[in-house]
Amino acid sequence: MTILVMGTIKLGEGEGAKAAKLFADHAAVVKTEEGCEEYSFAFDAADPDLVRVAERWANAEALGAHGQADHQKAFGRALRAHSPSAMSIDAWDGQHWRKLI
């Protein structure tokens, strides 16, 4: 069953630009994980310190393995340097309903 993950990470003031490479490098590694179908970060157009998270995993096991991966744990530690003040990330089980565009 497909797992969708969406959320936000609010970084400290002025930290978005400083953290951009960390996010890009991490996404490149995660995209090679088995079961990763989509993994991206986007900086909000109105707030450059707000990061939007979008992920799609083939199944819950793939998402679970991702959470235990050494590079994911290292990313979490590195993220602390950018003073995250709030994080909200949720997962849903889902299936493709229809193509909109």
PLM region spans:
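Short flexible/disordered coil segments
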Residues: 7-8, 69-70, 95-101
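Residues at secondary-structure transition points
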Residues: 17, 48, 66-74, 95
